[in-house]
């Protein structure tokens, strides 16, 4: 059986994975599980699957978690017994993908206008109750701030 490379440009695939994680975190989709990170394709045309359920689950208190899977030690304790915060976890995850921290910073800058527009877009959702809108807006704002704190 022939072997096909999954991605011709592994750095680009790693960057895409990091970007997908950031978008899930910033949109309040605390449900970024492996189904939403699966690979699809056949022959030599493999790639990431679409996001199957982009619902911002963190709008609902019962589902308000940052991510279902740990990354970069987020929430764990460091060598001094302090919790690993989001920015450090993102830096660690970025490094584990073989990317530079400057790539993370560039992605944060690229996504910032999209994320900053989310509160207005959330407020425009006619079927989402005000309580859930408020929670989701807080999540979006706090997550962006935490990701940028160095």
Name these PLM-found stretches.
Residues 1-34, 38-150:
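Anionic ligand-binding catalytic core segments
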């Amino acid at each position: 059986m022939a072997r096909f490379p999954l991605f011709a440009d592994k750095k680009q695939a790693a960057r895409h994975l990091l970007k997908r994680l950031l978008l899930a975190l910033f949109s309040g989709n605390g449900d970024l599980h492996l189904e939403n990170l699966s690979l699809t394709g056949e022959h030599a045309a493999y790639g990431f699957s679409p996001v199957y359920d982009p619902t911002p689950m963190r709008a609902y208190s019962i589902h308000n978690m940052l991510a279902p899977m740990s990354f970069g030690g987020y929430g764990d304790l460091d060598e001094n017994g302090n919790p690993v915060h989001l920015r450090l976890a993102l830096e660690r995850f970025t490094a584990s993908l073989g990317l530079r921290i400057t790539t993370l910073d560039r992605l944060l800058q690229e996504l910032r206008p999209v994320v900053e527009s989310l509160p207005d877009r959330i407020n425009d959702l006619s079927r989402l109750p005000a309580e859930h809108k408020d929670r989701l807006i807080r999540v979006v704002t706090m997550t962006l701030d935490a990701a940028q704190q160095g």
